[in-house]
Amino acid sequence: MGAIERNGYTFEPEYSVTRQNGAIHVYRRGQFVEEIRFDFEGEFPEHDLIEELVNHYCYENKI
């Protein structure tokens, strides 16, 4: 699962299968902005979950 780019922002997901959680690191112009934490079930988070979290973040922050 690679980085997602939207309007000058980069969203880089990472996750731990053992702990069943992850985070999406948000960057703007290479500078760290914040971290979006999430939980998931299974071997890896579904791509749709990551997309939904990114879309929600963009909507809430008017990106």
Describe the residue ranges of each PLM region.
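N-terminal acidic leader/helix
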Residues: 1-39
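Mixed-charge, Lys/Arg-enriched low-complexity segments
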Residues: 31-63
